[in-house]
Amino acid sequence: MATALPTESKNNLKHVEWMWKSNPNPWSKSEPAQWSHYSDVENLIIEEAFLDKKPKAILDDYYIDFQDNLQVLNTDYNRQRPVKRVVRNREDKHLRETRFMDLPTTSARSFGGQYGWVSPFVVEVRRDLRIKPNELPSKKPDMIPTLVEKAANGIIEEGKYLGKEREAEKMANMLREKKNKDMKEVWKCCAYLYSLESFLYQSLNAAMRLVGDKDKEDEWRSKIRTLGPFCLLLWDDPIHIKMKTDMVLYRGAKLKPEQIAAYETMVNNPDEHRSFQAFSSCSRNRQKAEEFGNTLFIMEVKGAFIADLSKLSEYPNEEEELITPGVCFRVKKVEFDRKKNKHFIYLELFQSSS
């Protein structure tokens, strides 16, 4: 069965959400009901099976019985919980705290060293795939089918490793359907998959954030073969080809005192600049970004490659902008707001050619 991007109803989560009852005793009638969210990809799998009028949807750890509205553990039929299908306006979708407040680099090393505008992870992916800088898929469309297939296979392999094989197969199949399309369509699919709440964006960024940490080099290099092809397709953006300027982005974080002190030190060294090595989700909406963490990054974009994901995302109200790996920053100012009990760290973002 064909699987399309969220322009088609089977993959449109903007109005539908499946939830499972998460009370310690899901059958208790005396406790207030507590409902938890499935991941975005699990929601896609469940909703597709529901619309196809299948008796059940098979997930990695559970299956959903549509006749009795139950979640059942795959290995134990007696482990059951109620589920429900919620239809709502897209404005009501819950905000994703971790996506906009986890550190854009490793916690031990709060920012990467300066590497220039191409991430070493991307450089190593190109080397592994034997792709020259002037032979990117956006410039050589004949490369697209092979790269898409490698990306799909890598997603599946990573999913198996994490125990998320069915989620991985769902995303891989969505990507495979674009392998005979042009690079713009492939990139939109990659951006959509990245925007979903799943292991894919988490695993990719976890690996890329380790770049520059000598103790973790083997760890991030081990992901080049599996996650590298997808990373390259997402990085080779044929749509946002002009650097963005004169905009302000926001990102919450939970920083330790020593991490805040490191940013304060950079204020006194205006010529010092660092770079983000992973894809970093930020918001144009200060109020939403300020909801989470003890620190708010306020980022003034002087000139950098940044992609607007809000029109592709299942969460348009997050106003998500994706900062490309390798974008550099200077720390302009660090303030502490006593009323809000929050640090404000002002960054200046720019693209380095060095």
What would you call each of these model-derived segments?
Residues 2-160:
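Eukaryote-biased intrinsically disordered, low-complexity acidic regions enriched in Ser/Thr/Pro
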Residues 18, 69-72, 250, 285, ...:
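Structural signal for hydrophobic/aromatic residues that build the beta-strand cores
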Residues 314-316:
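Conserved mixed alpha/beta core segments that line enzyme active sites in large multi-domain catalysts
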Residues 319-330:
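Short coil-to-beta-strand transition motifs
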Residues 339-354:
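Short solvent-exposed strand/turn elements
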